[in-house]
């Protein structure tokens, strides 16, 4: 191993060595599905049920979601590599080709994912060029038959057996 500078490029490469799951955060805004993808998801607490993810402060999608009463979190499965890229795109229909389910609360979920978490924002924590979004979970749906997708070194991968 060798020392490397702390440039954003070097940090992104270093952080990319840590494998992570991928989630979609989505809701309906004035009848339109709005969502984004994140690979910085973490369970936080069982009592109360809290989870968190990080969002870039430069996101143009987050301002549309951050004041809503309910958000849908879908934990993407290994069949969702294309969906993850589409949801992370800066332009275009992020839900193209995806089957979704909307709840009366406005939360939107992607069908065929491993877990749905309906949630509401509990706390926003400024953290450098990102914001840590802490969410209180109000409902869960688990689909144990769906294996997860993993984001590692800028690529989507499947877990080995």
From Swiss-Prot:
Its EC number is 1.5.1.37, 1.5.1.42. Signal peptide: none annotated. Its main location: cytoplasm. The keyword Cytoplasm applies. It catalyses: FMNH2 + NAD(+) = FMN + NADH + 2 H(+); FADH2 + NAD(+) = FAD + NADH + 2 H(+). GO terms for biological process: dibenzothiophene catabolic process. It holds the Pfam family Flavin_Reduct. It is found in: Cytoplasm. Keywords: Cytoplasm, FAD, Flavoprotein, FMN, Nucleotide-binding, Oxidoreductase. SMART domains: Flavin_Reduct. InterPro entries: Flavin_Rdtase-like_dom (IPR002563), NADH-dep_flavin_reductase (IPR050268), Split_barrel_FMN-bd (IPR012349). SUPFAM superfamilies: FMN-binding split barrel. Pathway: Sulfur metabolism; dibenzothiophene degradation. GO terms for molecular function: FMN binding; riboflavin reductase (NADPH) activity. One of its GO terms (cellular component) is cytoplasm. It comes from the Bacteria. FMN binds at residues 30, 37-40, 54-61, 88, 94, 151. An NADH:FMN oxidoreductase which supplies reduced FMN for the '4S' desulfurization pathway that removes covalently bound sulfur from dibenzothiophene (DBT) without breaking carbon-carbon bonds. Can also use FAD. Provides DszC and probably also DszA (DBT-monooxygenase and DBTO2-monooxygenase respectively) with reduced flavin (FMN and/or FAD). Belongs to the non-flavoprotein flavin reductase family. PANTHER family: FLAVIN REDUCTASE, FLAVIN-DEPENDENT MONOOXYGENASE, REDUCTASE SUBUNIT HSAB. This is NADH:FMN oxidoreductase. The gene is dszD.
């Amino acid at each position: 191993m060798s020392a490397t500078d702390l440039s954003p490029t070097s940090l992104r490469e270093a952080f990319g060595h840590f494998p992570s799951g991928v989630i979609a955060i989505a809701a309906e805004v004035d009848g339109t599905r709005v969502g984004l993808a994140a690979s910085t998801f973490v369970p936080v607490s069982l009592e109360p049920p809290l989870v968190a993810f990080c969002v870039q402060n430069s996101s143009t999608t987050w301002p549309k979601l951050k004041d809503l009463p309910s958000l849908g979190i879908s934990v993407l499965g290994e069949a969702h590599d294309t969906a993850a890229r589409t949801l992370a795109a800066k332009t275009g229909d992020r839900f193209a080709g995806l089957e979704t389910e909307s709840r009366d609360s406005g939360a939107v979920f992607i069908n065929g994912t491993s877990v749905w978490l309906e949630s509401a924002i509990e706390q926003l924590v400024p953290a450098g060029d990102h914001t840590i979004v802490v969410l209180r979970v109000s409902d869960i749906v688990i689909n144990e038959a769906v294996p997860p997708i993993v984001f590692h070194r800028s690529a989507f991968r499947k877990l080995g057996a």
